[in-house]
């Protein structure tokens, strides 16, 4: 028994002294492996008398249990120490700016950045975001928006139509995000305050037009909404988006089937050697269209125009992105040129706020 106690003490000391998992495994094999010291003692039980086997067997198994428990406890300690050392070696400060690397790094596309900027600005004014399908019905895209039969936008050369259904109805790629406004008015009761960003499609392609582009439209429906509210919202948006403290705006009469009166908005700017500066100068630049929602549109969406009125506006996201960040050709936004994106794109984590731009 004294030999067993000495062996147990020796093994436990070796376990405590093991400095890593490899050394601990060597101790385990030497003690509990097929040819281990404790395993050898267990093999001698068959040669003992029943009384000896009962006494010695209990003692050897007790020693084996103590060694097994000590191995498990030491293994947990070593694993925890190894993890702590690894974490200490791999610690990084995630608040530090990204380091320049010869390897290519991904960039945030200017359209994604601008989408974040404008949704954040309007969210601060209390607007929610509404979305809808790219493939729309003629009814939602045109009829409920007061487009009369024979309107040029309903012709094949302006709109991507699908083949007619057996009943003669046609599906199409939406030409604006206004159908989202229709869907919102049909499913929500006033007051309504939403913006509708998304992809739109028209048959057009040149330096300032592409068959697929992005729009954001806004809609407010309430009992007391008026053009003064619309003017304030657009004025505050332009100041925040173009990062100026003051900007003059000019509202010009226009015509859209879904608004009455209809207006187009110009903003003050100065052109200097190919650069556009907003909030100063004597030039004017058209930026969006807007107006009071036509009573026919309200009726088509189940809203009583004698009780409620509202206003709406729409602008091209691609266009305002080009104006803010100095891009000259709209088509480059969709070409997937990595060199172009490395110049105009944004490095992750380098834009301090969603509403921030180049000046930040």
Swiss-Prot record:
| InterPro entries named in the record | aa-tRNA-synth_II (IPR006195), aa-tRNA-synth_II/BPL/LPL (IPR045864), Phe-tRNA-synth_IIc_asu (IPR004529), Phe-tRNA_ligase_II_N (IPR004188), Phe_tRNA_ligase_alpha1_bac (IPR022911), Phenylalanyl-tRNA_Synthase (IPR002319), tRNA-bd_arm (IPR010978)
Q: Which cofactor does it need?
A: Mg(2+)
**Which processes are annotated in GO (biological process)?**
phenylalanyl-tRNA aminoacylation
Q: Which PROSITE patterns match?
A: AA_TRNA_LIGASE_II
**Which UniProt keywords are given for this protein, alphabetically ordered?**
Aminoacyl-tRNA synthetase, ATP-binding, Cytoplasm, Ligase, Magnesium, Metal-binding, Nucleotide-binding, Protein biosynthesis
State how the cofactor is bound.
Binds 2 magnesium ions per tetramer.
Does the keyword section mention Cytoplasm? Answer: yes
Annotated catalysed reactions = tRNA(Phe) + L-phenylalanine + ATP = L-phenylalanyl-tRNA(Phe) + AMP + diphosphate + H(+)
Cellular component, GO, one term = cytoplasm
MF (Gene Ontology): ATP binding; magnesium ion binding; phenylalanine-tRNA ligase activity; tRNA binding
Q: Which HAMAP family match?
A: Phe_tRNA_synth_alpha1
Q: How does it assemble?
A: Tetramer of two alpha and two beta subunits.
Q: Tell me the PANTHER family matching this sequence.
A: PHENYLALANINE--TRNA LIGASE, MITOCHONDRIAL, PHENYLALANYL-TRNA SYNTHETASE
The record's family statement is: Belongs to the class-II aminoacyl-tRNA synthetase family. Phe-tRNA synthetase alpha subunit type 1 subfamily.
The protein, known as: Phenylalanine--tRNA ligase alpha subunit
Q: Which organism is it from?
A: Bradyrhizobium sp. (strain BTAi1 / ATCC BAA-1182)
Q: Which gene encodes it?
A: pheS
